[in-house]
């Protein structure tokens, strides 16, 4: 069972900057996402679950053009504060919003070039993942892209063992793993709504990450 929104907020308020310690398994997947998301020509990025702003900083430093804007949201006030400190030098190009916990993207219909979410959907219930995908489809431009990274099922002997152990901990006490569990992102994207342009799994130190880039199917 997924954590309540209040439990998630309390956990990540306490966790704070320690979230950056997960870079040892996250960075390779984030780099792969960046390499395939064609970010150099976009003008607007929305990140659902910005955390400490670590990935946003990477995008603003190395991937986005100097005219591109970034908007990020997070449920945790501590994470928003850390992201504000980290991204302050980018001035008006950056907007950070503390989420109420509702699955909502603060953007007009068909106004965003890229919707990004990394290591967040594995925290949500299946219902909330579907709601997020619906919101992402609403705000993306017709040629926009949904860019995702998540914990996923292991593909090697070691990562399969890690998956089993992680799921056991999640069932026993979700708070021990921050409310996150391995999920299959591809199973949550309705084929009538999304066309997957890129799909890859990377394993680092026994932890498997799924990378997906999808485009909205024209209606």
Language model: regions and residue ranges:
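A short SAM/SAH-binding and catalytic strip from SAM-dependent methyltransferases
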Residues: 114-127
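A short acidic, Gly/Pro-enriched loop at the edge of an enzyme's catalytic core
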Residues: 105-115
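Core SAM-dependent methyltransferase catalytic element
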Residues: 193, 201-219
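Conserved class I S-adenosyl-L-methionine
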Residues: 1-40, 54
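Short glycine-centered segments of the SAM/dcSAM-binding site in methyltransferase folds
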Residues: 44, 143-145
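Class I SAM-dependent methyltransferase SAM/SAH-binding core
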Residues: 46-103
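C-terminal alpha-helical "lid/dimerization" subdomain adjacent to the S-adenosyl-L-methionine
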Residues: 149-192, 199-201
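A short glycine-rich, Lys/Arg-flanked "PGG" loop and its adjoining helix->strand segment in the class I
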Residues: 130-142
């Amino acid at each position: 069972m997924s954590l309540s929104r209040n439990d998630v907020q309390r956990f990540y308020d306490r966790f704070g900057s320690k979230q950056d310690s997960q870079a040892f398994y996250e960075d390779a997947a984030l780099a792969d996402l960046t390499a395939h998301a064609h970010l150099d020509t976009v003008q607007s990025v929305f990140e659902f679950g910005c955390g400490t702003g670590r990935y946003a900083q990477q995008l603003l430093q190395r991937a986005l053009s100097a005219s591109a804007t970034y908007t990020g949201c997070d449920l945790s006030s501590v994470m928003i504060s850390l992201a504000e400190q980290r991204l302050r030098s980018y001035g008006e190009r950056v907007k950070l919003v503390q989420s109420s916990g509702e699955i909502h993207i603060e953007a007009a219909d068909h106004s965003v070039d890229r919707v990004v979410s990394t290591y967040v959907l594995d925290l949500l219930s299946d219902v909330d993942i579907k709601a997020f995908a619906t919101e992402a489809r609403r705000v993306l431009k017709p040629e926009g892209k949904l860019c995702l990274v998540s914990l996923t099922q292991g593909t090697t002997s070691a990562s399969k063992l890690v998956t089993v152990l992680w799921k056991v901990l999640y069932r026993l006490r979700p708070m021990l793993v921050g409310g996150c569990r391995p999920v299959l992102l591809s199973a949550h994207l309705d084929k009538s709504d999304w066309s997957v342009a890129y799909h890859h799994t990377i394993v680092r130190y026994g932890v498997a990450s799924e990378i997906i880039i999808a485009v909205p199917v024209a209606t």
